Structures are given as structure tokens and as C-alpha cells.
Curated annotation (Swiss-Prot):
Its EC number is 5.4.99.25. Residues 65-192 form the THUMP domain. Coiled coil: none annotated. SUPFAM superfamilies: Pseudouridine synthase (SSF55120). GO terms for molecular function: tRNA binding; tRNA pseudouridine(55) synthase activity. Substrate binds at Y305, Y376. This is tRNA pseudouridine synthase Pus10. Keywords: Isomerase, RNA-binding, tRNA processing. It comes from Pyrobaculum arsenaticum (strain DSM 13514 / JCM 11321 / PZ6). It catalyses: uridine(54) in tRNA = pseudouridine(54) in tRNA; uridine(55) in tRNA = pseudouridine(55) in tRNA. GO terms for biological process: tRNA pseudouridine synthesis. Belongs to the pseudouridine synthase Pus10 family. The gene is pus10. Responsible for synthesis of pseudouridine from uracil-54 and uracil-55 in the psi GC loop of transfer RNAs.
């Protein structure tokens, strides 16, 4: 039988523990742990060699090789006057014995965490991995399992036994148990919770994340209740684009993801939030892919703005009719002067799809601008000293000031 001959070749070359021998043939059989498989293989090799020895065949070398990693064979040889010392496993150095002890260490660290799912990761000595690769290559074995996979699987299996109400999730686990077989340490990593939703800003002077100037509060501060709900150490927000702190965000709101870092509770319920300044409507839990999608989507979103504008010169309806020329315009903008200190001089090109207007008084009018995401709307109105072209002020031949800015809708 090829398995037996291959196993005999393995023990002739290397002293292997039950796990490391059994792992070479992990794909042969089902529902058998590598230790059990290795024990069974050694038992068969032992029985065959002892039988041949008693028949007078010269199998002493095979018995000695097997005895280095098999107690019954050592005892048999001792009975016929041949002493063989036990040797460490060539691959793992006997590290595979009792790896389940790390599950016990992990359970202690997991105590007090309210979680549902976990995954196991491991760090193994480089020499161990090199020796495993050497053995597999020299024996031309194609039926094996990697030692790293076995370590993770066995520890995960023991954790499931001890934590019967939890489940393994290799894609999006709440926590990751990292086992370092080099140092003998276990570290539990609490993965962040990502909550998707939409927010509306009903007031002005509200920044997204940082307080500056005359900002009254921030969206980040308003959403701190989510950090507290999940017992997190910190929280950050990932937003699809941004509006100025003095602009309202109306309509159906702007998409965002709230990231709660180092949470203690993964099963809490997410409640919506509302006060006089901000509304947050949670959609559900999400992942990093959604964060990346938000960032990309912000570049192509189409937005509808309402702008209340003050004109230095009096205007008539006929004057505003000139603005129809801006519908379908391609606008070139350099980094606005108001944020130039924060960003290098950079050119961007954005589309203005539609422009509508309403004259409120000779010096005040409303603009409705439907445009590509990323357009600096204030600069599109007043021109920013020629850094944005074309612009509304240039077309009306007057100085303009933005009094109010609202994002009405994001398509």
C-alpha cells in the first residue's frame, strides 16, 4: 500500500511526532485528527516490523528509526536488548503536542467580551515552516495539510468546545485569536465595528470631524453615542465626500460609515439619532469594501445645491437669464484660496449639468446647481479671483458673496 510505504520512508528519514506524520496524509480519510492518523500509521508500521523481526527478517534499522518517535517500538527493542532514545520531532520540535493549551489562554482573554464570532491566526517559527517544506518536497507528498492550518484548526476546534455559543467566521470575525508559537503568547484582537447609514445636517457651523474657527460642534461628536453603545475606545467616520461646515445637508442625507474601534460589545442594537442639528439613520453593519466604495462614489456622485447669493450690483431677471450658459459647462478649478494652506495647488475639472435661479430681491438671488461631486460650489459662484472658470460672478459682471449653501440631494 502506497501510504504505508511512504510513511515508512518518512520515519526512516525523520523522527516525526504523531501530528506531523499524520498531517502528511491528512487528505486520506475523513473525520480523523492528524494525531490519531499518525498514531494509527505508526501502529501499523510497528506491527508489520515486529512481525517481520520475529520471522527472522532484518528490519532492525526500521525498528530503530520508528522507535525514535514511537514508545511501543522502544519498549519492544528494549526487550530484545536494543536501547533507543526518544528524539524530538524533526519538523515541530514537539511544539504540536498540546497546542490546545493556547485555547485556554485565549478563553481567559475573551472573558468579559460580548461577541459572536471569532477566527484564529498563528505565528510559527520560521525553521519549523522550512523543515515542513523540506520533508514534503523530499517525500513528494501531495496529500498533506499545512502545519499552520492544523494549528489554527485545532485551536479553533478547542475554542468551539469551550465557547459553545460562538461560531467561526474566517471572513468577518468579531475577534481574532492570534497565537504566537515562537513566544508562547496569545493576543486577542478586537476587530472594529462598521455601521453604515446616512446623515442630515439641519444646522450650520457643524463640521464633519474637526472643530475649527466658528464651528459649534461636529458630526463625529454627535455620533459618539455609537462608540458608547458598543463599548469602544474610539470612533471615526468615513464619509462619501464632504460639505462645508456652514452648509446644511438635507434631502435623503449623505452616506457614511461609522467605525467603532476596540469594541467590548458586538451584539448591541444600533439606534437612530436626532437632535436640532443632526439626524443619523443607520442602515446596518458593513465592511471595508463599503468604505472604499463610498470614497470612489464621491468622485462620481451628482449633487443638487441651493445657494443664496448676495450681489454687489442690482440684478434683474434678464441678467440672471445669462446663467443658462452655465448648464452643461465644464468647470476648471484650482485649489481654493481658503484651503490652499491645507492642500497643494491642484487642478480639478468638474461638470455642471444644470443651473436654475430665482430672483429674491435686486441684490439677492437663489441658485440651484446640479453638478458633479467634488465641485467647489462657492468658488463656482464668486470665481475665487479667477481660480475657477467659468463662474457665475464673471458671467454677471459683479462681485458675489455666498450667504447660504445647502446640499439638497445626492443622486
Amino acid at each position: 500500500m502506497e501510504l504505508i510505504s511512504k510513511a515508512l520512508e518518512a520515519v526512516r528519514r525523520y523522527p516525526l511526532c504523531d501530528s506531523c506524520l499524520g498531517r502528511l496524509f491528512a487528505l486520506m480519510g475523513y473525520g480523523i485528527e492528524n494525531r490519531e492518523r499518525g498514531q494509527a500509521i505508526k501502529t501499523i508500521l510497528h506491527m508489520a516490523a515486529v512481525s517481520d523481526y520475529r520471522k527472522g527478517k532484518d528490519v532492525t534499522a526500521d525498528l530503530i528509526a520508528l522507535a525514535k518517535c514511537h514508545l511501543p517500538t522502544r519498549r519492544f527493542l528494549a526487550g530484545v536488548g536494543i536501547r533507543v532514545d526518544e528524539e524530538r520531532c524533526y519538523i515541530c520540535g514537539d511544539l504540536m503536542e498540546g497546542v490546545e493549551k493556547y485555547a485556554e489562554m485565549a478563553v481567559e482573554q475573551l472573558r468579559g467580551l460580548d461577541f459572536v464570532s471569532f477566527a484564529v491566526g498563528s505565528t510559527l517559527p520560521e525553521e519549523l515552516l522550512e523543515k515542513e517544506a523540506e520533508v514534503v518536497k523530499s517525500l513528494l507528498v501531495t496529500t498533506g495539510e499545512s502545519v499552520k492550518h492544523e494549528v489554527n484548526r485545532r485551536i479553533g476546534k478547542e475554542l468551539l468546545r469551550r465557547l459553545s455559543d460562538k461560531r467561526v467566521d474566517k471572513l468577518r470575525p468579531n475577534v481574532v485569536v492570534n497565537v504566537d508559537l515562537v513566544s508562547g503568547q496569545v493576543k486577542v484582537v478586537r476587530n472594529p465595528i462598521l455601521i453604515g447609514g446616512r446623515y442630515l445636517k439641519l444646522g450650520r457651523k457643524i463640521a464633519q470631524a474637526k472643530r475649527f474657527g466658528n464651528v459649534r460642534t461636529t458630526l463625529l461628536e454627535k455620533l459618539a453615542y455609537l462608540r458608547d453603545t458598543f463599548g469602544g475606545e474610539d470612533h471615526v467616520i468615513h464619509v462619501s465626500g464632504r460639505e462645508d461646515s456652514d452648509a446644511r445637508m438635507l434631502g435623503s442625507g449623505r452616506p457614511l460609515v461609522v467605525e467603532v474601534k476596540q469594541p467590548l460589545r458586538y451584539t448591541a442594537q444600533v439606534a437612530p439619532f436626532r437632535d436640532k442639528d443632526v439626524i443619523f439613520l443607520p442602515v446596518g453593519f458593513t465592511d471595508r469594501n463599503e468604505v472604499r466604495r463610498l470614497k470612489e462614489k464621491a468622485k462620481t456622485d451628482i449633487k443638487l445645491y441651493r445657494v443664496l447669493v448676495l450681489s454687489e450690483s442690482p440684478l434683474k431677471q434678464d441678467d440672471l437669464s445669462k446663467l443658462s450658459a452655465l448648464s452643461g459647462a465644464t468647470v476648471t478649478q484650482y485649489t481654493p484660496r481658503r484651503i490652499k494652506r491645507l492642500h497643494p495647488r491642484k487642478k480639478r475639472v468638474r461638470m455642471v449639468y444644470d443651473v436654475a435661479w430665482r430672483l429674491v430681491s435686486p441684490h439677492v438671488f437663489e441658485l440651484y446647481i446640479r453638478c458633479q461631486g467634488g465641485l467647489y460650489v462657492k468658488e463656482f459662484v464668486h470665481g475665487d479671483g479667477g481660480r475657477t472658470a467659468p463662474n457665475v460672478a464673471e458671467l454677471l459682471n459683479t462681485r458675489l458673496e455666498v450667504l447660504e449653501l445647502d446640499v439638497l440631494y445626492i443622486e
